[in-house]
């Protein structure tokens, strides 16, 4: 009986929910930082374009919309990871996978938000002066958004895989 309790303690320590919670936090915090940066940086360009050409403001909102979607990716991953966290049946393996998933989604979202902000600001200003640049700006924004989408997909895969067993199996106990 003591071997079974020791195995359960080794596979599911009391501190494993901490790592899962850090993954949840990283997912939402970094994606929101990325979305906020993208929105703020693009808004500066939209404001300056609005002074020169007020009729171009509605077409200039694409970077803000793209940046807002990044926060949704983080929120969805946050909810999926939160469902995984359960103190009584939450293994250290699962906790590290959840931490990795949160960091993957969060940091990809942060990089994407920075890319959207910079390319959105320059793209909006350039498209206001030369309307032919509007399509180029949209393509740059789509590829910048894809960075966050890659992290989102990998985070969902990480959240769906892995072992959450707190009981040692024959393969686990024989390798020790």
Curated annotation (Swiss-Prot):
One GO term describing the cellular component: vacuolar membrane
GO molecular function terms noted in the UniProt entry: proton-transporting ATPase activity, rotational mechanism
Keyword Ion transport tagged: yes
Main location: membrane
Membrane-side (Cytoplasmic) residue stretches: 39-62, 120-136
Transmembrane segments: 18-38, 63-83, 99-119, 137-157
Keywords, alphabetical: Hydrogen ion transport, Ion transport, Membrane, Transmembrane, Transmembrane helix, Transport, Vacuole
Top-level taxon: Eukaryota
Description of how the protein assembles with itself and partners: V-ATPase is a heteromultimeric enzyme composed of a peripheral catalytic V1 complex (main components: subunits A, B, C, D, E, and F) attached to an integral membrane V0 proton pore complex (main component: the proteolipid protein; which is present as a hexamer that forms the proton-conducting pore).
Protein's name according to its UniProt entry: V-type proton ATPase 16 kDa proteolipid subunit
Native source species: Entamoeba dispar
Gene name of this polypeptide: VMA3
